[in-house]
Each structure stands twice: as C-alpha cells, then as structure tokens.
Amino acid sequence: MILKSISYHNFRNFIDEKFQIHPQLTAILGDNARGKTNLLEGIYFILRGEGFRESREEQLIKFTEKNSYVDAKLQERKTKDVSNLRIDLTLNDFGISKTYFLEKTKKGRHSYLKNLIPVVLFSPEQIEIIDRTMSIRREYFDKFLSSIDPEYKKKLTNYNQAFRRRNKILEIGFESENLDAQLDYWNKLLIDNGTYLIIKRRKYINYLNSNKTIDSKEFSIEYIENKISRERFSEILKKELLVKRTLIGPHRDEYNIFMIEKKIQKKDIHLYGSRSEQRLGLFWLKINELKYLEEYYRKKPILLLDDIFSELDHKNQKLIFNLIGNYQTVVTSTEKELTKLINLTNDSSYDTINL
C-alpha cells in the first residue's frame, strides 16, 4: 500500500492545497518558512492521528481559523484499489476535537488507525533521544509502543494517573486519612499497569538486541527495570514520605545505548560517543523501527525525512540513501541536496513538490 495523494484545508500554513505523492520518492523543495515540514507533518498526521512537533494540537489549525481537515488517498500496489481517509479538526471552547473517517464513515481512533500504512520519521531533532536525558528515551519508547499496542497506551495512561494520585497522597503524608489503605489501592494499580509496561518494553528491547548491526558497527541497549512490587513499596515507604514522591516503578526505568567495539568493549554513546557515533546509534534505532513495523503490520512503512541531509556526513548519508529504494519516501530537501540524493541512489524514479 502507498500514499497516492494528500489534501489540506486550513492545516498549519496551508489554506487549500492538494499534492500528488510519488510511489517511490517525493522531494519537497522550497525556501525556509514555505511549509515543507508542515506538508510532511500532515502525512504523519493522517497516518498516525497526531502531529510530530511539540506544539499544541490547536496549532495544527491555521491561525484565526476554527476548522481544519487533512484527507488522503491510499492505493494498494497490486490491485490498485483506492482507500479514502480524512481527519477533521475542530477548535471550540473546550479545546480541540478530532473526527476520523474511512470511506466517509466515522470511525473511532483505533478502528481508523489499525489498517493504515505505518510511518517512520527521521529528523535532526531526534538526536535528543541519544544525547539528552533518560526521560527523553523513556518517552521515545513509550510513544513507539503506544502507537502499535492500544493496550500499552491504555496501561501507560492508567499508570501515569495512578502515579500522580499516589504522589498527592505522599505530599499530604501522615495527615492523610487512611494512609495505608489509600496507598494499598494505588500501589495495586501501579503494579498491575506497570508490570504490563515492563513486559512489553523488555520484549521490544530484546528485538533490538537481536538486530545489532548497522554499517559493520554493532549496537545494543541495556534495559534496567525499576522493579515494582508490594514488598518494594513497603521497604521504601519512609523515604517516599520524606521526599513526597513515588520512587520506584517503570517511570524510572533506564535505557543505556552502547556501541560495541572489537566485539568486546561497550561504549555508552550518550556519555562518550562522538556526534557521528550518536547519529549512527539513532539510525540503528530508527532502521529497526522500520523493520519492526514492517514485520508487525506486514506492510512497508512510509519513510519521512525532514531536512536531515545537511546534518549528516557522507557515510551516514549513504545509510539513509540505501533505505530509500526499499520504502516509499517523502523528503524535505534543497535542489543541491536532491541532486546528490539522485546521484547516490542512481534512481530516476522520483517527483518534486515546489513550495
């Protein structure tokens, strides 16, 4: 299945626009602030039901407008059958609402998303997964696992709600009525939901560690579970009452990413990796994300590349170029970068969108 076309109404800076997407490679060209990343984000949005930037969802709607939509056509490669999909955005006094449609029939989010093409994004900002804090890595894995497993998303939401409520009780401390009973209730919720999260995280990390190699280099992830149990809650309660927050559980899990040198030595690339090694580690994560999604859904994902070529050295550029022949790809680029891309991939099968 491929993305055939996409249309925007009052989405970001687009008023009414429609774009055809090439089955192999589409390059979005244009000066800064012309909307290259907005176009890319719209593709991500129609296939994932959310944008990929940190801004609030209300900002997906064009400034001063109250309603927006993105619609698209997907096509089966073999049968040429076409599917129509659309997401409406509406801004009201209570915030923003999203309505999902397949073939003009209203759907729930999960029902809408489950049969679409998976999508993977590369962008320069994602290097923060490697070079910033542990919470960024936890957020990355949680977001990925939530995107493929509705139960994971539900359990994560339940866990975070229970975590916040338990912290409120710890803030009140001994002044709270029925302290032990209240803590027992929230402890059980944290254990039940947290155990599911840990199992699913461990399963995906095992997958990554079974696919270690990229460009003759090997990487691995050390997943350190912050175990959660009634016994541990009992042992640490006095300290938690002192600091007034929950100190154990998967919200404190750690992911350490290593490059393996000479088959023996492991280098923590967050702490000791060069910029090039950190980028290679990021590519290792994202390439495995592509492969995992392809195996999981039995469909080839769409690859979105946002302004990455100026950030990469020649060696890492070639790694990305090698991917492009295997997946439908949409890339934001400049004329100069596009020329280099076409020369390196030896592929004349592409189209451009000029903004």
Where are these regions (language model features)?
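Structural recognition of the conserved hydrophobic beta-strand(s) that form the central parallel beta-sheet
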Residues: 72, 328-335
